[in-house]
Structure formats: structure tokens, C-alpha cells
């Protein structure tokens, strides 16, 4: 067991938000339940599983909220995926746009099915009020010890929103209200040093460095963007040097988180 400033991890391997959806599949072809790997790998073995970002209300984003698909509908599902997820050199470019079922449905349908996992719940909002509401719902519905932490996602490129003006107020209001340790997710495309200092000053337990890097992929024939949202977030091996640079700069700046 690892204690990271109050965040208890079973080991050092922590999944990133979205990769494993809500921690359990639902239906044979589950677009948003995701987690097909959970049919083959025991997710309890991870240090922690970071749940796909949830918002106060269900949100379609740039994808779909439809979860169950018949075999005949798979071509349509693949078309939607191509508009939200594209392979890139040494990585993936995604623009799901916080497509999610909403926090209430997560707690009703998925939370009870993943009790053996060490969960980090990623929260996304567009105002301090929304983050305060999300924290209040987590406090009410998640028993003590049932989450390793909550993650504040204020760095998503795919929702076309400027988080910079709200970050300080989000931290001042929502961090003290949370019964669980808070992780702040940093973007290498924003002023991450300033955001890290705000996090340190407002009681955040840890930083997630980094979120995806804003990128673009074009159709080589037409020159049109391949993603529905035009731009997307680049993840994978391609961004590891950027992540290491951000971590190094945070350390050089004296950030203790």
C-alpha cells in the first residue's frame, strides 16, 4: 500500500480517466460502459482505477449516450468512434467531449458493481457551483473509504471552455467541502505552474500531470479534420516527454504535491 499525501494506492500503476470507462462493461457492445479489459483483467490489481469524468447531468458531448448496440448497428457505432477517436503517431487523438451518463446514474448503476476496485472518481464542471454540487453528491453517496480520491478535471480541451477564470474559485469552494482527497488534473497547454500553486495553497492532495495535449489530425486527401470537434487530446507514448518536462518544471518551481 502506498500513501500519497492521504491518497491510498495499492501500487504505483494507476489508470487514466476514460480508458476504462466506469470500471465495468454494460451490455455486449457498450460504448460508454467501456472496460472490455475488465472481462480479462481483474481491475482490483491496479493501484487505482480512475473513472471516466462525470458531470452533474448526462452529457452527449461529441459522441453518444447510447450504451447498448445490436450487431447490425455496429457500423454506426464505429462511425461515431472515428469522429471521436483517431490513431496518431505513437498515440491516440480523442475528442469525446466529456460524453458521460452523469453522476447520479454512475452511482446508481456502476458504483455498486465496482466495490472491489480502488477508485478515483473524475469530476468535470463548468462553474464553481457545479463542482460544489458534484462534491456534495459524492459526499452523500460514497461511503467513507470507498474512493481513494476525487479528481477535478479543469483541463479538458474537448469541451470548448476556458477553465482558467474559474479554477481558483473551484478550489476554494470545493476542496474544503470534499470528504475525500482531491487531485487536480493539469494541462500542459494551460498555465500549469500557476494552477499547481493554487492547488497547493488550497489543500489539494496531489496533481495529475498531465492531461492530454491539444492536437489535430487531417484527412490527407481532403485536408479536413478527422475528428468531429476538429481538435482533440493526444495521449500515449508520444506525450511522455512532455509529461516528464511538466513534472520536472513543477519540481523546479518548488511544488511539494
Where are these regions (language model features)?
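N-terminal capping/small domains of soluble enzymes
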Residues: 1-119, 125-129
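Metal-dependent enolase-superfamily TIM-barrel catalytic cores that perform enediolate-based chemistry
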Residues: 135-187
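Catalytic cores of alpha/beta
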Residues: 26-37, 129-140, 190-202, 249-253, ...
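Active-site beta-loop-alpha junctions enriched in small/polar residues
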Residues: 18-20, 54, 124-126, 155-157, ...
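Glycine-enriched alpha-helix->loop->beta-strand junction motifs that scaffold or abut catalytic
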Residues: 45-46, 143-146, 179-180, 198-206, ...
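Hydrophobic faces of well-ordered beta-strands that scaffold small-molecule active sites
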Residues: 13-16, 47-52, 119-123, 148-152, ...
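Alpha-helix-loop-beta-strand connector modules within alpha/beta enzyme cores
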Residues: 103-116, 165-188, 227-257
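Glycine/Thr-rich beta-alpha phosphate-binding loop at enzyme active sites
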Residues: 92, 154-166, 195-255
Amino acid at each position: 500500500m502506498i500513501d500519497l499525501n492521504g491518497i491510498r494506492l495499492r501500487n504505483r500503476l494507476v489508470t487514466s480517466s476514460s480508458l476504462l470507462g466506469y470500471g465495468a462493461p454494460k451490455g455486449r457492445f457498450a460504448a460508454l460502459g467501456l472496460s472490455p479489459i475488465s472481462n480479462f483483467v481483474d481491475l482490483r490489481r491496479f493501484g487505482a482505477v480512475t473513472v471516466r469524468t462525470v458531470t452533474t447531468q448526462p452529457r452527449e458531448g461529441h459522441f453518444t449516450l447510447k450504451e447498448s448496440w445490436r450487431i447490425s448497428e455496429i457500423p454506426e457505432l464505429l462511425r461515431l468512434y472515428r469522429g471521436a477517436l483517431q490513431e496518431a503517431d505513437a498515440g491516440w487523438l480523442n475528442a469525446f467531449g466529456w460524453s458521460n451518463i452523469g453522476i447520479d446514474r454512475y452511482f446508481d448503476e456502476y458504483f455498486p458493481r465496482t466495490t472491489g476496485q480502488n477508485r478515483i472518481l473524475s469530476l468535470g464542471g463548468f462553474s464553481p457551483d457545479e463542482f460544489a454540487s458534484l462534491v456534495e453528491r459524492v459526499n452523500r453517496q460514497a461511503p467513507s473509504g470507498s474512493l481513494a480520491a476525487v479528481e477535478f478535471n479543469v483541463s479538458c480541451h474537448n469541451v470548448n471552455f476556458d477553465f482558467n477564470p474559474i479554477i481558483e474559485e473551484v478550489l476554494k469552494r470545493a476542496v474544503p467541502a470534499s470528504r475525500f482527497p482531491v487531485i487536480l488534473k493539469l494541462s500542459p497547454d494551460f498555465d500549469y505552474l500557476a494552477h499547481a500553486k493554487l492547488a497547493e495553497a488550497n489543500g489539494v492532495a496531489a496533481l495529475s500531470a498531465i492531461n492530454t495535449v491539444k492536437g489535430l489530425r487531417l484527412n490527407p486527401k481532403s485536408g479536413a479534420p478527422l475528428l468531429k470537434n476538429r481538435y482533440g487530446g493526444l495521449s500515449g507514448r508520444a506525450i511522455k516527454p512532455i509529461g516528464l518536462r511538466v513534472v520536472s518544471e513543477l519540481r523546479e518551481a518548488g511544488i511539494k504535491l
